[in-house]
Amino acid sequence: MDEGIPHLQERQLLEHRDFIGLDYSSLYMCKPKRSLKRDDTKDTYKLPHRLIEKKRRDRINECIAQLKDLLPEHLKLTTLGHLEKAVVLELTLKHLKALTALTEQQHQKIIALQNGERSLKSPVQADLDAFHSGFQTCAKEVLQYLARFESWTPREPRCAQLVSHLHAVATQLLTPQVTPGRGPGRAPCSAGAAAASGSERVARCVPVIQRTQPGTEPEHDTDTDSGYGGEAEQGRAAVKQEPPGDPSAAPKRLKLEARGALLGPEPALLGSLVALGGGAPFAQPAAAPFCLPFYLLSPSAAAYVQPWLDKSGLDKYLYPAAAAPFPLLYPGIPAAAAAAAAAAFPCLSSVLSPPPEKAGSAAGAPFLAHEVAPPGSLRPQHAHSRTHLPHAVNPESSQEDATQPAKDAP
């Protein structure tokens, strides 16, 4: 059997020494991965990274351009000049928030209607919202018509003015109307202040002056230091009413002056005002009521209120007639009011009744106190003495008073 098969040539075994000095470069078809990364990584990686970044920036710019086209025109006109990418994103966020809020309101309405509940808003508010929605639709249609047929562009000043005017009108329609005569928070503030100081007034002051006079306009009192004048008493007008009692037991605080020469008027005493002309028979539609503090009257004129005052401190606040006479005359008082006041206060009849030769000019122009005051009359020389006295001095009446023996100056 071995004879039929030709003998194969015996394979010659090559030893290691036979391969020394031979070049086998053709046998290696590729390089290992490590050597590939070391050599070609820098050049092959830069190109894909640049392409990826460019594609990413292009996508961002394309999306921002689409958002800019989808924005409403009134949002675009809020900023002048070129719309930057950040501005476009901010306007888009603002618009999305508004749409989200509107969607939430509509969703709540739908749920309320499904549950059979009444509308969340009043019919007036619902009609106002519907009108505002229609107003916005009409404004948008006007802008589209001007841009299409009149060739108006959003960058033109007249277009911007038109849009601003329409939005201003829409804002006025949404805001509630406020009465121009009185602010919304004025009455609650005055009521709160009166309620807060009510207990303090009861503790150390005379009864509050209540005024109920519907025919006259509310005006400020001439003496605002009494605590009853000012804006808190604007809506009320009436004659002082003091209930029977003995409020003299209430504690009174005396304010000492810095110099110590003269005690200042107490707030409780300043609050006690003689209201002449507040009600009938002194009520006049044209003449405003006037008030006179006690310390401007002689003790005899204020005798009817002495039971309510502290006898010990009365001489400190009321000027004696012999020391400093105060001729009183109000030019705005009518003849009937002056006669009634003279009958009520006999000691003032000489100064309230006009002289017979000048009866026709009793309500003449007022005179300033510093122009017609007699040189012999004495005034309180104190740093905190009043300079805004609510009366004027008549020279004739002052001369008549000077002749009386009870009122001679020392």
Curated annotation (Swiss-Prot):
Gene3D superfamilies named among the record's database cross-references: 6.10.250.980, Helix-loop-helix DNA-binding domain
Residue stretches making up the bHLH domain: 44-99
Expression sites by tissue: Highly expressed in the caudate putamen, pineal gland, granular cell layer of the cerebellum, olfactory bulb, piriform cortex, hippocampus and hypothalamic nuclei. Moderately expressed in skeletal muscle, heart. Weakly expressed in lung.
Chain positions covered by the region annotation Disordered: 209-251, 371-410
Keywords: Biological rhythms, DNA-binding, Isopeptide bond, Nucleus, Repressor, Transcription, Transcription regulation, Ubl conjugation
A GO BP annotation: negative regulation of DNA-templated transcription
Stored InterPro entries: bHLH_dom, HES_HEY, HLH_DNA-bd_sf, Orange_dom
Keyword Coiled coil: no
Listed name of the protein: Class E basic helix-loop-helix protein 41
SUPFAM superfamilies found in the cross-reference section: HLH, helix-loop-helix DNA-binding domain, Orange domain-like
Entry keyword annotation includes Transit peptide: no
GO molecular function, one term: bHLH transcription factor binding
CDD domains documented for this protein: bHLH-O_DEC2
Major subcellular site: nucleus
Pfam family, one: Hairy_orange
Covalent cross-link Glycyl lysine isopeptide (Lys-Gly) (interchain with G-Cter in SUMO2) as placed by the record, residue numbers: K31, K121, K240
GO CC, one annotated term: nucleus
Induction of its expression: Expressed in a circadian manner in the suprachiasmatic nucleus (SCN) of the brain.
Oligomeric and partner information: Homodimer. Heterodimer with BHLHE40/DEC1. Interacts with CIART. Interacts with BMAL1 and RXRA. Interacts with NR0B2 and HNF1A.
Function description: Transcriptional repressor involved in the regulation of the circadian rhythm by negatively regulating the activity of the clock genes and clock-controlled genes. Acts as the negative limb of a novel autoregulatory feedback loop (DEC loop) which differs from the one formed by the PER and CRY transcriptional repressors (PER/CRY loop). Both these loops are interlocked as it represses the expression of PER1 and in turn is repressed by PER1/2 and CRY1/2.
PANTHER family: BASIC HELIX-LOOP-HELIX TRANSCRIPTION FACTOR, HES-RELATED
Domain named Orange: residues: 131-166
